[in-house]
Amino acid sequence: MSNNIPPIRYRRKITGMSAILLPLLSETEIDWSGLRDHVARTADAGLIPAVNMDTGYGNLISSRERLEVLRATQETVAGRPFIAGAFVGDSPDAPFDFDQYRQRIDEIQSFGGTPVIFQSYGLTHQPASQLIESYARIGEHAGSFYAFELGTMFAPFGAIYDLEIYEQLMRIPQCLGAKHSSLNRRLEWQRLQLRDATRPDFLVLTGNDLAIDMVMYGSDYLLGLSTFAPGEFARRDAMWEQGDSDFYELNDLLQYLGFLAFRAPVPAYKHNAAQFLKLRGWIQTSLTYPGSAQRPEADVAILEEILKRLDA
């Protein structure tokens, strides 16, 4: 596979999917009104809401909370599309648990969503042939799904697949696309080249919040960063499709926000998201789910300066 940079694809219509932050009223109480408002805000902007992802603490919330998020999302989108994380928690020595994945898929589909298959130790620790067989079983049961490559800077159970495995994943017809979260342009460019040669309708969904201009090269996106500013992301995407040079200035400002929020430790971006949404008056507190990484309060002043520039 060549490492050449793929060409820029001007005036392309971008598919945007935005992970939804789960807001809190207290350490033990979810802000359901704030969640519904943010799902509506995202869908109204023209982006596809993605719930129970990392941004929504999909690996931390209880099964009751997970189902309530799905119910609230279904009611809010009112027939519009949404996707949701299918997370199976396990341990490093656990076998692949198809039954747990099947249950998560059934839950999501019962509320009208399309599943995004989170990795797990049991899934990613398999030999390549068994790994692909597991995804094929998931596809046969789900009918349609999105895969998810997650770098270990986000979660210890994640894995970035080699290109041979990625090609086999693309050949599973029920797999509509895959989120790629390596934070590495070169690896994502390779996937775009492989996609173009193998299955042009397959969505390479960038999860690179440090390189949101990957959409210029043919990636679509499923980002946590867009939860900070779904309307601005939608406006940026429309500028690209229209050939509007203002795309670059807005993209630069959104990327500045991404560099701040997604610095190490990367999982603490969710605290920055809560701080930013509170500054916007969209949620009531900047609390995060118990067990989440935190940012210093000093970040708020920088976030406020970015918000003023976005609103200018």
Label for each model-derived stretch:
Residues 72, 137, 168, 235, ...:
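Alpha-helical scaffold segments in soluble metabolic enzymes
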Residues 31-34, 38, 65, 69, ...:
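General structural feature for long, well-ordered alpha-helical segments within catalytic domains
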Residues 3-6, 18-21, 46, 219-220, ...:
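C-terminal alpha-helical cap/extension of soluble enzyme domains
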Residues 2-160, 292-295:
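Active-site beta->alpha loop and helix N-cap motifs at the rims of alpha/beta catalytic domains
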Residues 140-266:
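Catalytic alpha/beta core domains of metabolic enzymes, predominantly
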